[in-house]
Amino acid sequence: MTIFDKSKRGRRAFTIPERDVPEYPLSERFSRRTPLKLPEVSEPDVVRHYTELARKNYAVDVGIYPLGSCTMKYNPKLNERTANLPGFRNVHPLQPEETLQGCLQLMYELKAMLCEITGMDDMTLQPAAGAHGELTGMLIVKKFFDDRKDTKRKKVLVPDSAHGTNPASASMVGFEVVEIKSKNGMVDVEDLRKHLDDEVAAVMLTNPNTLGLFERDILKIAELTHNCGALLYYDGANLNAIMGKVKPGDMGFDIVHLNLHKTFSTPHGMGGPGSGPVGVKRHLVDFLPFPNVEKEGNLYRLTVPKKTIGRVRSFFGNFPVLVKAYSYILMMGRDGLEKVSEMAVLNANYLKKKISRFLKVPYDGFCMHEFVASAEEVFKKTGVRTLDIAKRILDYGVHPPTVYFPLIVPEALMIEPTETESKETLDRYAEILEKVIKEAFENPDVLKNAPHRTPVRRVNEVLASRKPVFRWRGKYEAGDRNQQGT
């Protein structure tokens, strides 16, 4: 039931104070001709409605949220208070630069810290998400080669284990995407070598990759890429594994995008809010989006790079997210960020060892911050799919891992526990998953019809994709909901 369904005419949650200024009639042309369609509810109705929704929801503040490649770590509440300081909360982006010096200083110093962490020379903070950062990076790649009149470079090479946004971002800029095979979970260097030629603009990589494995041949990959005149692009989705240990810039990457909402602990989920800064080496600095923040003497200024790709976001990006990330980095410090990566890798390896007793883990040895298990054998013997396992996990009050990704692992479960989970939490999660796998063999129908205890049972995903309901349409019967759309 929506808040609109609880509306009763004349019911109010507030009283408007008496007017203390003269009445001024509003011109008819500015007046609404129809009543504003807002719910009429009391304050208890509002509080109870949203409290009920919160109780039905799941978040990292409720329990472990081990979505692979999402880094759903606990977010310190101090960062929220920092972002809510009046000096940050009450500014307007159209104020004169002279009155925004505190905000500009924060952005300038955040850029410097992120450049130090990644080994880049400059950075834009404008992109609003990881995929937005990828798009920005690909626009920089295109502008770089266009500026050099090297117009035949139309290809971008992407591993078969890459995030789906990698080929999507390259395609949006007009590049042809070529898939590179994996060998033992890592880039097949020989296959890469075959595809590198003077038509390749960039190679996009994640390191550690989406299997949680560190690309040991990264220096060779960088050498081959640069020898053919192409750029090496770093998808920073998995930076949480290597902070303080190795810098993407030292591996040979020319462009980096980060996810502040993942690695640097700003709350995210359900589409935002996010931030996807893009860092570049010196030869690409002139192509960054504008405005860029620079320091001139004692003042901070908004500047336009010489060969800029233009704006990619209004104003300064998602500024409150930048404040939270800045607060997090200062709070953790250099040693703290290194400890974050150490604990993320330790937790992933601990959980991997426990889960490997009852699920196949395709790639042996140590993983980095995440790992991928496969329920292929479970499916062959019981008919229970990874999706069924994920749905059943919900009945135990915890969130399932990412499923069916990366695509090169059949019936994949991609698990990233992050550094903020305790040993006890990891033990409980492994016990739950083991119990679910045991149920798959003893009573597979329990899993095939799961979840059984959640407010919303298994949805009809085919119908949801063919007749989606994107927004509220007014009061209508439950039986008519699937007929509503946008």
Curated annotation (Swiss-Prot):
The keyword Oxidoreductase applies. It is an enzyme of class 1 (oxidoreductase). The keyword Ribosomal protein does not apply. Coiled coil: none annotated. InterPro entries: GcvPB, GDC-P_C, GDC-P_N, GDC_P, PyrdxlP-dep_Trfase, PyrdxlP-dep_Trfase_major, PyrdxlP-dep_Trfase_small. GO terms for biological process: glycine decarboxylation via glycine cleavage system. Belongs to the GcvP family. C-terminal subunit subfamily. HAMAP family: GcvPB. The glycine cleavage system is composed of four proteins: P, T, L and H. In this organism, the P 'protein' is a heterodimer of two subunits. PANTHER family: GLYCINE DEHYDROGENASE (DECARBOXYLATING), MITOCHONDRIAL (PTHR11773:SF1), GLYCINE DEHYDROGENASE, DECARBOXYLATING (PTHR11773). This is Probable glycine dehydrogenase (decarboxylating) subunit 2. It comes from Thermotoga neapolitana (strain ATCC 49049 / DSM 4359 / NBRC 107923 / NS-E).
